From Swiss-Prot:
InterPro entries referenced in this protein's UniProt entry, alphabetically: ATP_synth_F1_ATPase_gsu, ATP_synth_F1_gsu
Cell compartments where the protein resides: Cell inner membrane
Record's subunit section: F-type ATPases have 2 components, CF(1) - the catalytic core - and CF(0) - the membrane proton channel. CF(1) has five subunits: alpha(3), beta(3), gamma(1), delta(1), epsilon(1). CF(0) has three main subunits: a, b and c.
GO cellular component, one term: plasma membrane
Key word Cell inner membrane present: yes
Protein's UniProt keywords contain Membrane: yes
CDD domains: F1-ATPase_gamma
Protein name: ATP synthase gamma chain
Length: 290
C-alpha cells in the first residue's frame, strides 16, 4: 500500500526528471535549427558541384580519365565510413545505422573490409565483432565546421591514394527535414557520379589549364561532400534525440498525472478515515456523557 510520503517523493522525482528531459529536448531543438540552417544552405552548393563533376567527367580528354580520384580500379579492399552518435538518448538512430551496415556487409569477406568509425556506437559494434577499424573518431561531430571536414577528408583520401582502400562507401542519415531522416549508403570514392552513362564529344576550353583546375576542383568537391554528410548526420542525430526526449517528456507527464491522481485519492481516503475516527470519537463521548 503506497504512503503519502512515498507518493510525494515519486511526484517530486518525476518533476525533476521532466525538467531535465524538457531541457534536453529544448537544447536539441536549438542545435537542430543551427545544423539544419547550415545543411540546407550547403546542399545547393553540393548539388551544383556534383553537376559540375558529372559534366566535367563526360568531357574530360582521355589522358585525364586515369586521374587516381576518378579512375575505377580492381577492388581488393573496401572502405566503409560509418556515422553514429557518441551519446545515447536518440531513439533508434544508432540501431538503424548498424542494421543497415549489417545488411550492406552481409556476404562480404571481413578481411576485405576496412572501417572508419565516427562515434562511440560504431566503434563499439565494430570492435565487438572484431572488424578492422582503420581509424576511430570519437566526439568528432561536436565540431561540424569545414575545417573538421577537411581533416576527415585528408585521412580518407590519403588511404585511397596509397591503396589502403580501393573504394569507399559511407553509411549515414540524410537530413531531409525535422521529421524525416533516411539512412543512405553512398559510394564516394572513386569520384564517379552515378548519373554519368556516356561521354560527350564536345570541345571545351579549360583556362588556365585542365591540370591546374582538376586537382583543386576534385578536392573541393570531396571535402564539401564530406562536410554535407557531417552536417546531415549531426542534424539527424539531434532530430532523433529531440523526438525521443519529447516522447519521454510526454510519458513523464502522464506518469506525473497518474501519481497526482493516486496521491489525491490516498489523501481523500486518509481524510475520510480521520473524519470517521473523529465522528466515532464524538459519538463515543456523547454515549459516555449520557
Amino acid at each position: 500500500m503506497p504512503t503519502l510520503q512515498g507518493l510525494r517523493r515519486k511526484v517530486k522525482t518525476i518533476q525533476n526528471i521532466s525538467h531535465i528531459i524538457h531541457s534536453m529536448e529544448t537544447l536539441s531543438m536549438v542545435k537542430i535549427r543551427a545544423l539544419q540552417d547550415k545543411s540546407l544552405r550547403l546542399k545547393p552548393y553540393t548539388e551544383e558541384l556534383n553537376n559540375i563533376l558529372m559534366e566535367l567527367i563526360t568531357r574530360l580528354p582521355n589522358e585525364y580519365l586515369n586521374h587516381p580520384l576518378i579512375r575505377e580500379r580492381s577492388v581488393y579492399k573496401t572502405g566503409i565510413l560509418v556515422f553514429t552518435s557518441d551519446l545515447g538518448f536518440c531513439g533508434s538512430y544508432n540501431l538503424q545505422i548498424i542494421e543497415s551496415l549489417k545488411k550492406f556487409i552481409e556476404g562480404k569477406r571481413a578481411q576485405n573490409l576496412v572501417f572508419y568509425s565516427i562515434g562511440f556506437y560504431a566503434q563499439r559494434y565494430l570492435s565487438s565483432n572484431n572488424f578492422n577499424i582503420r581509424k576511430k573518431y570519437i566526439k568528432f561531430l561536436e565540431d561540424t565546421s569545414f575545417s573538421q571536414a577537411k581533416i576527415l577528408s585528408k585521412d580518407l583520401l590519403d588511404d585511397f591514394l596509397n591503396y589502403v582502400i580501393d573504394e569507399l562507401y559511407v553509411i549515414y542519415f540524410e537530413f531531409i527535414n525535422i521529421v524525416k531522416q533516411e539512412v543512405r549508403i553512398k559510394k564516394i570514392l572513386p569520384m564517379i557520379p552515378v548519373e554519368v552513362k556516356e561521354r560527350k564529344e564536345e570541345y571545351f576550353l579549360f583556362l588556365p589549364s585542365l591540370s591546374s583546375i582538376l586537382d583543386p576542383l576534385l578536392m573541393d568537391i570531396f571535402e564539401t561532400q564530406i562536410h554535407q554528410i557531417m552536417l546531415d548526420s549531426a542534424a539527424s542525430e539531434q532530430a532523433f534525440r529531440r523526438f525521443a526526449m519529447k516522447r519521454a517528456y510526454d510519458n513523464a507527464q502522464k506518469l506525473h498525472s497518474k501519481l497526482i491522481f493516486q496521491l489525491n485519492q490516498l489523501r481523500q481516503t486518509q481524510i475520510t478515515k480521520e473524519l470517521l475516527d473523529i465522528t466515532s470519537s464524538i459519538e463515543a463521548m456523547k454515549e459516555e456523557v449520557k
